[in-house]
Amino acid sequence: IQAISQHSLPLNDANLNKIVDAIGNAKIVMIGEASHGTSEFYTIRAELSKKLIEQQGFQLIAVEGDWPSTQAVNRYVKGYSVEGATAKDVLMKAFHRWPTWMWANEEVATFTEWLKEFNINREEKIGFYGIDLYSLFESIDEVLKFLSNNPKHQVDLEHAKKAFTCFEPYNRMPEHYALSAAHFSDECISEVASLLRSLRNHKEQYSSKEEEDLNVVMNALVAKNAESYYREMMSDEKSWNTRDYHMVEAIHELRKYY
C-alpha cells in the first residue's frame, strides 16, 4: 500500500495530459483494459480519447467490436443516417453479441454523443469502427444486401452469393462450420477469398459517399479472416493469432482510407 501511495498517479485531467504528452507523435495509440465493462475505466478511456482527438489530431476510434455493429455508431456520429434518436438507441439496436455492459452502456453512449457533436461542423469527421472478426454471417449479409441493391456490381454480387451459399448449411452458427471444417474438410476458403479479391479489384467502381467503398471491402475482409479463425479454432491454438492479425490488417486498411 505504501508503494502504491508513493508511486501511483490519480487519473485526473492534469495527469491525462501527461499521458498525451508522452504519446508524442505516435500514429496509433492502444488503450488496453484490465476488464471489460468497468465504468470507471470506460470513462477514463473516453476522456483520454477526447484529448487525443482534440489535442493530437487523431482521426478515428477502432474498438474490439464487430464491424457491422460499429458502423451504426459511425453513421450516427457522422450524420450519415438516423438509425436512432439518441446514441443509446443506436447502441441498443446495434450490439447484440455481448451483454449491454460491453458496448451498449452509458459511458459509450455519452462518448458517442460527444463525438457526434464534435463532428457537426467538421469537414473531416472522426470515425468509429470495429476491428474484430466475429461477425462472419452479419458481414456476409451486409455485403450481399448492398450488392443486391446495386446490380451494376454483378460480378461481385455473384461472388457474394457463392460465399453466402457455402455458409448457409451451418445455420448461422460458426461453431458448426468449425466442426465441419475440422472433421469433414468442408471449407469456404476459396469463396470468401474470391469475394474479397473481386471487391478489391473493383474498388474504383465504388463510391466514397458515406464510406460505401470502405464498408463493403471491410465486411468482405471480416468474412475472409473469420472463416480462417473459425476453421482453425477446433484444431489449432493459432486461431488467436489469426484474430490478432485481422485486427492489425483492419487498422492498416483504416489508416490507408484516412
Give the predicted meaning of each segment.
Residues I1-Y258:
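Structured catalytic-domain cores with a bias toward divalent-metal coordination
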